[in-house]
């Protein structure tokens, strides 16, 4: 959609171009050894259907079928994952009414489990709060790292409280920390 306001953050709506550009870009950023001092880790963003929102409105809802999601919006991410991207950033948008930042079906079931992504799933800038979600919803959906730029003083204690209260299992935190450390090391 040419009215989409964040076209500068994408390779375009052509699936072949997404796949054509994703791998070389990631290889250029990460090189043969992402830990080498001259290289940086690549983040594939914005997962998923970020450019398919109704009327091209930024941070809106994408009303699409499962078939369209997989055919038009997934291939670039599959290529990015196969090319070794160390992280994937969630989209501010919603898919069929469900905010991506709070979607276990998209972030855990599809991205982590089905596609086998073992890197870090991170929020966009204050993405959980801006999506009207809680830290708990983000954690349960599969967010590993939160960009709590303005709200970190509340977010960090909230994560501790959720674990201590048994609302989020320690195994979920262990998984997130493992992914973050794998990326850093």
Where are these regions (language model features)?
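Glycoside hydrolase catalytic-domain context in secreted enzymes
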Residues: 1-185
